[in-house]
């Protein structure tokens, strides 16, 4: 396993991060520990979760993922060996996360409540990386183009950072990161931390990045090189579409598409043809399509860690061992030809 520095911290994280969002929904409470055991055996020291998980978000399963991880920590007595990342929800009408029944947003009070609940579920007294799951301001996230307004007062970035500073001073969190964030948002958070040294500096951003969505390269990748804010890339397989399992209208039993029908981000016009082209590249070079897609993400120089997810051990093993796949200049050139023909179809 390869290890990379997390932003301007003294922490080295594995180039592959274990994603967990299906635990407690598609994956049972027994399957989560099996995945963690295998990940550690393969050298992975970085786990990512969120207060909202399992996915899709609902009151019945909220918090289950963190609880599975916390139980594993207590059984293994190895908390110190894992770099643990979790997230506080952004603005949404999810009225089951907060004690007062309000929807989620990133007020100081909600941030304090959220981190304390995560610590309890995770059975730990500190979190290594605490991330803002999505911005608390008008912005289009989780797919689509254009600007999207949302109602209500917007919590000021400096107030959010002030709350984060408080929980850091209390020893509850070591470092902070962003998620589903824009170049403007990343730089505003960095600017406030630069102007007020008492505010924490963001060390990472967790955004979608894959062969169908390379939007990150257009603005945010420069921030990595100039500011040291690393990308934690999620959805490297485009929610499974880059494996080819949904091609031609296929609907595998037990898949996320079959169970929840919420993957429309990767069903835009032209996407199936582009996916076919990437599948052809994998076939041409005798590679597994999922490993091609994963290793493309892992090997980008602005990626700190590739967040993989799996609902079976076979999927997990393919994802983890993708780090051993060599992508030659010829393979990368073929990938870029497809990308330039139809760039960023699924932002």
Where would I find each of the regions flagged by the language model?
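N-terminal binding-site loop/beta-alpha segment at the start of enzyme catalytic domains
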Residues: 1-88, 112, 125, 169
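Residues at the N-termini of beta-strands
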Residues: 15, 46, 126-129, 175, ...
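Active-site mouth loops of central-metabolism enzymes
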Residues: 20-30, 97-109, 147-155
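Aromatic/hydrophobic pocket-lining residues that form the small-molecule binding cavity
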Residues: 32, 65, 111, 115, ...
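Surface-exposed, active-site-proximal loop segments in enzymatic domains
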Residues: 56-63, 92-105, 138-146
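An active-site-proximal structural segment forming one wall of the substrate-binding cleft
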Residues: 107-126
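Beta/alpha (TIM)-barrel catalytic core signal, keyed to glycine-rich beta->alpha loops juxtaposed to Asp/Glu
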Residues: 135-337
């Amino acid at each position: 396993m390869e290890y990379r520095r997390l932003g301007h911290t003294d922490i080295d994280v594995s180039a592959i991060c274990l994603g967990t969002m299906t635990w407690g929904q598609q994956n049972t409470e027994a399957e989560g520990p099996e995945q963690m055991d295998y990940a550690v055996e393969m050298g992975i020291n970085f786990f990512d979760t969120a207060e909202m998980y399992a996915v899709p978000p609902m009151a019945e399963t909220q918090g289950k993922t963190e609880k599975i991880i916390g139980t594993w920590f207590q059984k293994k007595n190895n908390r110190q060996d894992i770099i643990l990342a979790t997230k506080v929800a952004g603005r949404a009408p999810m009225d089951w996360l907060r004690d007062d029944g309000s929807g989620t947003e990133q007020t100081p009070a909600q941030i304090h409540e959220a981190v304390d609940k995560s610590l309890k579920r995770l059975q730990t007294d500190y979190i290594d990386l605490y991330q803002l799951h999505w911005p608390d301001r008008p912005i289009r996230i989780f797919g689509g183009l254009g600007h999207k307004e949302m109602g209500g007062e917007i919590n000021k970035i400096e107030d959010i950072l002030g709350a984060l500073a408080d929980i850091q001073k209390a020893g509850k969190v070591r470092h902070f990161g962003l998620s589903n964030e824009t170049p403007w948002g990343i730089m505003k958070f960095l600017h406030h931390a630069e102007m007020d040294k008492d505010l924490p500096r963001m060390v990472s951003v967790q955004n979608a990045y894959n062969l169908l969505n390379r939007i990150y390269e257009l603005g945010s990748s420069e921030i990595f090189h100039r500011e040291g804010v690393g990308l934690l890339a999620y959805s490297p397989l485009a929610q499974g579409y880059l494996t080819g399992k949904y091609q031609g209208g296929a609907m595998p039993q037990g898949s996320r598409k079959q169970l929840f029908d919420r993957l429309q981000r990767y069903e835009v016009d032209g996407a199936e043809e582009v996916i076919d082209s990437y599948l052809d590249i994998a076939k041409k070079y005798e590679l597994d399509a999922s490993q091609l897609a994963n290793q493309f993400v892992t090997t980008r120089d602005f990626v700190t860690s590739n967040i993989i997810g799996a609902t079976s051990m076979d999927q997990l093993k393919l994802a983890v061992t993708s780090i051993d796949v060599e992508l030659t200049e010829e393979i990368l050139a073929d990938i870029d030809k497809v990308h330039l023909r139809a760039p960023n179809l699924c932002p």
